[in-house]
A protein has these predicted regions:
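Active-site beta->alpha loop and helix N-cap motifs at the rims of alpha/beta catalytic domains
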Residues: 1-83
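Catalytic alpha/beta core domains of metabolic enzymes, predominantly
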Residues: 55-184
């Protein structure tokens, strides 16, 4: 995840991480310029690009097509917008998509669970192909939302992850590395 919004710093970090793992990578920034610098550092890998929004979808689509990478779509708590972005991106030519309807660990947790459930039901039970893509959840938000003791943040992250796994999340972005947090 780019925290500095600095393309050169991000490129260097991505290169260093890629040299030290064969695991799948996810490059996270809403700034297409920053993401492109990271993608240039690892031309033979296919990281998940995170994320297209209503404001940057075209630039992100260009990156996904140019580098042949999957693209996450982020539309927090707005399933109509999420579906619209999926339609727009597929018509633009992006085929590998991952959907992020937003994750909330405190206020809005019920909305998070409902959104994941409604998306999966629409995709599976109602045949809505636009909502049939994999779902990504971000329990890592517990660390930003709680602002308290690390143990409390880790606990919140663990229960949000458990709920999302039970409600159809295919990918989770976690902060904690403690075994008890990763059990879900």
């Amino acid at each position: 995840r780019s925290t500095a919004d600095d393309p050169e710093k991000f490129k260097s970090t991505v290169k260093k991480v890629a040299e030290n793992t064969n695991l799948p990578l996810l490059l996270c920034s809403f700034n297409p310029t920053v993401l492109e610098s990271g993608l240039m550092a690892i031309p033979k890998r296919r990281p998940l690009i995170y994320a297209a929004t209503k404001d940057n979808w075209k630039d992100m689509a260009e990156l996904a097509i140019m580098y042949d990478c999957p693209l996450a779509i982020f539309a927090p708590n707005d399933l109509t917008l999420l579906r619209s972005l999926v339609k727009t991106l597929t018509e633009y030519g992006v085929e590998d998509l991952v959907l992020d309807p937003g994750t909330f660990s405190s206020e809005g947790l019920a909305d998070t669970i409902n959104n994941f459930t409604m998306i999966r039901r629409a995709g599976c039970n109602k045949g809505d192909e636009l909502l049939g893509y994999p779902l990504i959840g971000t329990p890592i938000v517990a660390w930003a939302e709680s602002g308290g003791a690390p143990e409390v943040s880790a606990w919140k992250e663990a229960y949000v992850a458990s709920m999302l796994v039970n409600r159809y999340a295919d990918i989770l972005i976690m902060h904690s590395t403690d075994g008890w947090v990763l059990l879900p």
